[in-house]
């Protein structure tokens, strides 16, 4: 029978490290939080990598620094200057407080620390080399005030953890994301990120939140944002939110900090989304940058080792105030008339995937939808084949007789059955099958007359470098030319001459947001995004001929009854059901 035993210190430290240090970005996060807590105003993050992985992380700050005694203590588990006893946990004002970071990092890496206290009169600094949690070197060195910590050979003694790391670009994207979130929460600090000797990101100290946003995400986005403010006796809300026309396919760009701590909160993200009401479609999310100051007695940050999750007292009042503040900000800018749907010229009904698209002008409001991107002429022979090809999933023959709410096509079957066709879901199914077929044949790109240029934040550009082969499978041809700038030279033929970068940007964001998918799952997700983005939207008026051809195209698909997401494309009311509804016979 197995006996209970006390684990040795090395095993304990590695278990603790597994909770705190998941990947290189975890190291960056812990070191940056320590630097911010040390009252730094300038922080340099220097990352080195080879073609396969990140090899070294060095963080340099101009903070308070440490004495030789403090430097040694810093590597002891649960040694901290942030709190003294359990009472301090109820009002934590620093980013770190457990005293686990350096000990956890040193347990699974080789760490070199150089530090000199600020204003203490010390003529020399302290240098420590720690390997596997043990201090193997200690010496005096010349050093500026502040602290530099270099981390190398991460997970050298835990190969099982190392093999689960993602590609170099994916890990870099996570590093950039950590710096972005802390830079947004701490405008009083100047951050600079260098990768292999090249500057990748830089923010200015005390330049204001908008300047930080502009530096990280671009001036165009910063100029389009709407300021939001709100207040309760225990809560202050400040930040910026996007207009409804600037939305995303997932909530990953809702950035929230509470008392200077960047956090992830589904409840707060949902409150932000709630504030938009019907200004956004159900599957769209805003861009938001919120800074919340909450009474520390209402915030429990001692929930998870990474401190990204928190608990809030009076959560319902807080989320309600956030939703109200967002609603008020949008109302104050008269945005109710904005429509977040895609421009009409980006919507396509494809009849022949191989046909070269020709752009057409946007129609007048209320005019029938013009699908000039694709030819909509099918020969009589093609129409007859459409009506006869297929198996048991083939749609019954039906004739469109109109539209309801510019969203549903009303059609009648030969036996009097009434059909309602969701035009977006139907077209999404058509495009999905076309893109899948083109991908499988490895011949599905439509070259753009003018390449679409994408200027991305470092986080997204790193993700895109990894995603280029995956996007190529779908028909996107993407080249990198310059720092964080890419040219989209071709798109899936089913999309036609799309000139909006939103499809590529949303695909990248989705891939970055969910790395848990396997390669086939990620490829499937990309195909779904391409189909959804390219499909005609609800609210687009279709001519009778376009309605008919969309139904014909739907009938040719392998699974015409549902869209790729599983929603129905067609609902039917047969004659007996209609008679019953009107109590006939």
UniProtKB/Swiss-Prot annotation:
Keywords: DNA damage, DNA repair. GO terms for cellular component: mismatch repair complex. InterPro entries: DNA_mismatch_repair_CS, DNA_mismatch_repair_MutL, DNA_mismatch_S5_2-like, HATPase_C_sf, MutL/Mlh/PMS, MutL/Mlh/Pms-like, MutL_C, MutL_C_dimsub. GO terms for biological process: mismatch repair. One of its GO terms (molecular function) is ATP binding. CDD domains: HATPase_MutL-MLH-PMS-like (cd16926), MutL_Trans (cd00782). This is DNA mismatch repair protein MutL. It comes from Methanoculleus marisnigri (strain ATCC 35101 / DSM 1498 / JR1).
């Amino acid at each position: 029978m197995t006996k209970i035993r006390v684990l040795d210190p090395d095993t304990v430290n590695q278990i603790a490290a597994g909770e705190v240090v998941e990947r290189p970005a975890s190291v960056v996060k812990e070191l940056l939080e320590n630097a911010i807590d040390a009252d730094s105003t300038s922080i340099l993050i220097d990352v080195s990598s080879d073609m396969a992985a990140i090899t070294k992380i060095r963080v340099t700050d101009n903070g308070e620094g440490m004495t030789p005694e403090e430097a040694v203590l810093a590597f002891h588990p649960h040694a901290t200057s942030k709190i003294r006893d359990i009472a301090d946990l109820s009002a934590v004002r620093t980013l770190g407080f457990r005293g686990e970071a350096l000990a956890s990092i040193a347990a699974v890496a080789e760490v070199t620390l150089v530090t000199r206290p600020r204003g203490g009169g010390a003529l020399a600094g302290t240098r420590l080399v720690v390997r596997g949690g043990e201090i193997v070197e200690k010496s005096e060195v010349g050093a500026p005030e502040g602290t530099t910590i270099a981390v190398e050979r991460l997970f050298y003694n835990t190969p099982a953890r190392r093999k689960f790391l993602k590609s170099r670009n994916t890990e870099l994207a996570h590093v950039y994301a950590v710096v972005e979130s802390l830079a947004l929460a701490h405008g009083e600090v100047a951050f600079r990120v260098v990768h292999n000797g090249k500057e990748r990101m830089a923010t200015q100290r005390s330049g204001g939140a908008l300047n930080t946003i502009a530096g990280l995400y671009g001036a165009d986005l910063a100029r389009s944002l709407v300021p939001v403010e709100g207040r309760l006796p225990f809560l202050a809300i400040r930040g910026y939110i996007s207009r409804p026309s600037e939305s995303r396919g997932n909530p990953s760009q809702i950035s929230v900090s509470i008392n200077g701590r960047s956090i992830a909160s589904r409840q707060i993200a949902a409150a932000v989304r709630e504030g938009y009401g019907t200004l956004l479609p159900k599957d769209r999310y805003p861009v938001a940058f919120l800074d919340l100051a909450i009474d520390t007695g209402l915030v429990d940050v001692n929930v998870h080792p990474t401190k990204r999750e928190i608990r809030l007292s009076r959560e319902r009042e807080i989320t309600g105030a956030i939703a109200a503040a967002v609603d008020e900000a949008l109302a104050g800018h008269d945005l109710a008339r904005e429509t977040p749907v895609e421009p009409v010229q980006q919507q396509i009904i494809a009849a022949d995937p191989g046909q070269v698209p020709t752009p057409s002008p946007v129609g007048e409001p209320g005019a029938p939808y013009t699908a000039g991107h694709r030819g909509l002429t099918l020969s009589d022979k093609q129409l007859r084949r459409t009506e006869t090809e297929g198996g048991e999933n083939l749609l019954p023959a039906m004739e469109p007789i109109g539209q309801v709410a510019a969203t549903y096509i009303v059609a009648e079957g030969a036996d009097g059955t009434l059909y309602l066709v969701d035009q977006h879901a139907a077209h999404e199914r058509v495009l999905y099958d076309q893109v899948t077929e083109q991908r499988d044949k490895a011949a599905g790109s439509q070259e753009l007359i003018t390449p679409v240029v994408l200027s991305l934040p470092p986080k997204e550009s790193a993700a895109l470098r990894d995603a280029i082969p995956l996007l190529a499978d779908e028909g996107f041809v993407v080249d990198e030319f310059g720092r964080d700038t890419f040219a989209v030279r071709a798109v899936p033929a089913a999309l036609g001459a799309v000139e909006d970068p939103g499809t590529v940007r949303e695909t990248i964001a989705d891939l970055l947001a969910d790395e848990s998918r396997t390669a086939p799952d990620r490829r499937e997700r990309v195909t779904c995004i391409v189909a959804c983005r390219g499909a005609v939207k609800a609210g687009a008026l279709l001519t009778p001929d376009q309605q008919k051809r969309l139904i014909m195209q739907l009938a040719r698909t392998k699974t015409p009854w549902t869209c790729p997401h599983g929603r129905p494309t067609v609902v039917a009311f047969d004659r007996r059901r209609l008679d019953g509804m009107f109590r006939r016979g």
